[in-house]
């Protein structure tokens, strides 16, 4: 078991497929099959023949064949999910810990330093953003967090969430399942597990959103307070951050191992951070100059060429 660091909350959560299915964002499932978001609306259609026929008819004649293909894909996916419904194969691990920012780094529980990259061009917010801006500065310097003049809510200014989720191989897998079909569906379950776990953390464990009442569509549209950037996201592009996450979470607790380049196995795994600041938002780091690359490599204690490889994953 991982060491329980002081002033932190560590949890391992296990879910059945049945519990996680409602949180699946079908848009990304169909995207993996090369289909536009409008075809994902089949997931919202009543299962009666009349409603399904009306859905097909809502498309142009040129697109109705593709709509039927989408319906078939969805039906096959639902059948597999029913087969796996009672299997507890969706697992998550999370840590809520005291944190403070120091420059473009976040120090977790005073012992693990996580360096981040900063935008070098002003974004939509009017700032050059870095994820460390959403955590209170050690000396309460004039950073983005202090400029917002927002009082801490349940210590959201000095707390960071770290998480990982994974989906293990279903026992009731049919030999006829295509590898790509299994891969895309378990990928969606891993993301859905992260969605469900994040909701529980906001409402019950971190507790800063106890009264949150959002529909599934609102959850998928990220209408909640806070963000959950995953490793590999545009604001967190360095895959080697997984090694620091492993140091904090001990990913093997839920069956995840890391390759030498920081990739997770099983492939249907998600890892990242949770920020609760009311003004936290997603952004893209974009291009960085050689000066920041050199500084970041120094803070990550790696060679520049090595960092370039992690950023190119």
Listing of model-derived features with the role each one plays in the protein:
Residues 124-313:
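C-terminal accessory domains/tails appended to large, multi-domain proteins
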């Amino acid at each position: 078991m991982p060491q329980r660091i002081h002033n932190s909350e560590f949890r391992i959560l296990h879910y059945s497929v049945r519990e996680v299915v409602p949180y699946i964002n079908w848009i990304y499932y169909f995207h993996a099959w090369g289909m536009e978001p409008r075809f994902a609306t089949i997931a919202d259609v009543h299962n009666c023949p009349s409603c399904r026929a009306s859905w097909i008819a809502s498309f142009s004649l040129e697109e109705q064949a593709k709509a039927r293909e989408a319906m078939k894909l969805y039906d096959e996916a639902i059948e597999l999910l029913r087969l796996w419904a009672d299997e507890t194969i969706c697992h998550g691990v999370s840590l809520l810990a005291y944190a403070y920012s120091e420059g473009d780094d976040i120090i977790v529980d005073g012992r693990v330093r996580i360096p981040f990259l900063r935008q070098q061009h002003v974004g939509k917010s009017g700032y050059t953003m870095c994820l460390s801006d959403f955590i209170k500065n050690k000396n309460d310097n004039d950073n983005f967090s202090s400029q917002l003049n927002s009082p801490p809510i349940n210590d959201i200014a000095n707390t960071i969430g770290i998480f990982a989720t994974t989906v293990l191989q279903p026992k009731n897998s049919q030999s006829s399942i295509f590898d790509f079909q299994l891969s895309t569906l378990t990928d969606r379950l891993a993301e859905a597990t992260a969605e469900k776990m994040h909701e529980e953390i906001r409402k019950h464990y971190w507790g800063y959103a106890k009264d949150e009442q959002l529909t599934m569509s609102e959850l998928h549209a990220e209408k909640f307070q806070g963000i959950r950037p995953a490793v590999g996201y545009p604001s967190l592009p360095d895959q080697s951050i997984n090694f620091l996450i492993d140091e904090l979470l001990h990913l093997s607790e839920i069956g995840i191992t890391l390759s030498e380049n920081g990739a997770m196995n099983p492939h249907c795994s998600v890892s990242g951070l949770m920020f609760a600041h009311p003004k936290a938002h997603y952004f893209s780091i974009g291009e960085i100059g050689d000066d920041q690359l050199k500084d970041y490599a120094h803070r990550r204690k790696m060679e520049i060429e090595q960092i370039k490889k992690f950023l190119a994953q």
